[in-house]
């Protein structure tokens, strides 16, 4: 009799274990699906970079090709530079590809003015905006070799802006005989950097 009772207890206990496992599993399943949720979304974000752009109206032709100069010789030419960038910028002028013989550059004065009113190389209608941005020898100008030490005050806003530049050279009236047969050359480079 006691043997039968023990067996029933074991059966009851054994049956209770799987029932408990099933019940706990059901509770976990219900818990995993019982949370409320909500989201909010910011629309797709986009980025694009701005631009700085410069052009000029020289038609890829040097401002000066002056030969057979004598002391006191002088001439002026104008160039118009246009900024069309989407960013505001600062523009500087500096020299490139400089060379001279017989110290001609040391006797050649260069004057550069910023202004407006002229779109032709002959400077018709040019009005200076103020004092010259450079006035010295070509040798001195040759030290201006980058944006960092370039000359100029133009700070165009975004969009299309123009600036005229008048460049005047004059060979010193007291140029010595040692400069005879001399040569000088330099390129003019305008560079814009965003402000």
Regions found by a protein language model. Give the residues of each.
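Surface-exposed interaction patch
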Residues: 25, 30-31, 35-37, 80-131
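Intrinsically disordered, low-complexity boundary segments flanking structured domains
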Residues: 38-44, 49-50, 94-100, 152-157
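Short beta-strand segments and strand-loop junctions that repeat across beta-rich extracellular domains
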Residues: 55, 113-116, 146-148
